[in-house]
Amino acid sequence: MHRPHLPHALALSIAFALALAAPASHAERSGAAPAAQEAVQDESRRLNAWFDEKFAEELRFSPIALTVLGRKELYDQLDDVSDEAAERQLAWRRATVEEMESRFDYDALDEEARLSWDLWKQQYELAAVRHRFRRNAYVFNQMQGVQSFLPTFLINFHKVESEADFQAYLSRLAALRKGFGTLLERARRNAEDGYRMPRFAYEGVLAEARAVVSGAPFDEGPDSALWADLQAKADGLAKAGTIDAARAETLKSQAREALLAHVAPAYRELIAWAEADLVNAQENPAGVGSTQPEGAEYYRAMLRLHTSTDLDPAQIHRIGLEEVERIHREMHAVMERVGFEGSLQDFFAYIASDPKFRFPDTDEGRQAYI
């Protein structure tokens, strides 16, 4: 229940798993000495088997990841979003790296196994950085918020092929309220300590949260997305002959109760907090580097985490200003060349609105665009 996209750790692990499936290494293809080649292959096979074990262990931390992969273990649960769970998972990652380094010889691996080693170790290092700055990352936000992710996840990934699957869905709705409570308490604490979203992010969260609990059974409007999904999945069981029509109606009644008992209060508590704290949010903050505790350190860490550059934030900012200045110079040169009089903003509006700068909305225009 972390994000509206594939959980970060899972995405990295899938990339890691793909590396395990990579073609044979250069040493294997080039006809290296048989004994040496066999030793490399043996060590690489041992490591890859170990990776398979650890990946299976890692998935146990995330019922959501298991479901995304099409598996039904822990199907009635959501991820534990408590601080204690995060500490346990980070400790597990650290222990796996220590075990890997003590049990295997990096220099005795083939090229692909070394890449897998590097990726596994990098996953731990990235997780450690994220954990170090976990308070700086917004608990709810308009881009990757749990308030939009969980309904999307349940609708798109929680398949119902039996009554047990349907009951697991309802259990997840109950777990949603508990998870929201944990996250909301963290968001409150963070905001009080200066880790607060900008106003537009609050507004985005509010819009998304309100949308989830708009419509039946929450109000008199058309069916909400979750309610429509639950009804369709109950009817699907009846259509498949798994249950009869009467049982499907019973399941729908249970689903309606779960939405009102768990989802409605969870979202309304989030909405109430966001509405109340909105007045404290800055309209257009300068950025986390200057508005958050340890913001400058967090910004530098995120630069290293998301890019391959060693430049510091000040250098990158300077490059940005220089690039804006360069582009403006080039645009002014174009304005002068075409004889346009007015400001740069006027020129942008002129280009955007004058039909002569647009391809016609025809097959010929589309072909010309291509």
Task: Give the residues covered by each predicted segment.
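Bacterial N-terminal signal peptides that target proteins for export
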Residues: M1-A11
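Bacterial N-terminal signal peptides
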Residues: A9-A21
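N-terminal signal peptide c-region/cleavage motif recognized by signal peptidases
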Residues: A21-A27
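N-terminal maturation segment of proteins
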Residues: E28-I370
